[in-house]
Each structure stands twice: as structure tokens, then as C-alpha cells.
Amino acid sequence: MKKTIMTRFGEVEFDPENTVLFVDGLIGFENLRDFIVMPNRKNGPLFWIQSVEEPDLAFVLTDPTNFFLDYKVVPDARERAKLGIGTDDDCHALAVVTVPPDRKVTLNLMAPVLFAPATNRAIQVVLEKSQYKTRHPLPA
């Protein structure tokens, strides 16, 4: 049965069976766990995740390999357990996008979102000893 929420994008209808469960929430938003994926109205590599519990909250995400071909995150056993997947299951690393007033877009490559399509679960992890930053600028 479809549900409807009022968001910054207007009224959005969604199927609760298709929500993405953020097992531990997102950093700073640990109490929010259910999100829906919303495509960007403009064609391109960016998309939105919209909180179901807090309709005013949405984040822009992207596949960082669109900009950094060598970016790779391999989930460890603990992370795979949280995602409910085995070693052979797909897991996508996504980056939270920041678009400040000066329009100098950055990606949070130090704390990627790991998404498991098989279970519709996601977690945000912090990479230790990373060469990347929380506000990593896009390549010129």
C-alpha cells in the first residue's frame, strides 16, 4: 500500500516496501533510518535520498567513481553483516554531495554510504587512514 509524505519537493508517493533502511542512520542523523531514493530532475550523476520520518530532510548522493575512477571501498565482515549480505553480493559506495552557496561542489569521500541492493540496506562508514576528505573537491 502506497504512502504519501509532503517534502521540499512537494507531495511524494512511495511504496514502504522500497524504502532504503539505514541500519545506523546517517552521521548526525542516527535516529532517521528510512529513506526513499528520488531521481534528480536534471539528467546527471546526482540523486536524492529523502527521509520518510523527517520530510524536510534530504541528501544529494552520487557514485564517486563518476569523478574519481580509482575510488573503491570494500566492506569488511562487520559491515557486510549490518547490510545483510555475503562476500559475493553487490555493495555500492556512494558519496554525500555538498553544494555550498559558492557552488564549489564537494563529495564526502571519507564517510561513504555503502548500499546493498539485495537487501535495500545502507550504512555510512568512516574510512580510517584515508587520503580522502569529508569535503573533497571535484577534479578540475
UniProtKB/Swiss-Prot annotation:
Pfam families, per database record: FliW
Location of this chain's protein in the cell: Cytoplasm
Gene Ontology annotations of biological process type: bacterial-type flagellum assembly; regulation of translation
Gene3D superfamilies for this protein: BH3618-like
Keyword tags: Bacterial flagellum biogenesis, Chaperone, Cytoplasm, Translation regulation
InterPro entries: Flagellar_assembly_factor_FliW (IPR003775), Flagellar_assmbl_FliW_dom_sf (IPR024046)
Main localization category: cytoplasm
Any one of the GO CC terms: cytoplasm
Domain of life: Bacteria
NCBIfam families attached to this UniProt entry: PRK13285.2-2
Function: Acts as an anti-CsrA protein, binds CsrA and prevents it from repressing translation of its target genes, one of which is flagellin. Binds to flagellin and participates in the assembly of the flagellum.
Family membership noted in the UniProt record: Belongs to the FliW family.
Subunit description: Interacts with translational regulator CsrA and flagellin(s).
Full protein name: Flagellar assembly factor FliW
The species this protein was found in: Syntrophotalea carbinolica (strain DSM 2380 / NBRC 103641 / GraBd1) (Pelobacter carbinolicus)
Lineage, highest ranks first: Bacteria, Pseudomonadati, Thermodesulfobacteriota, Desulfuromonadia, Desulfuromonadales
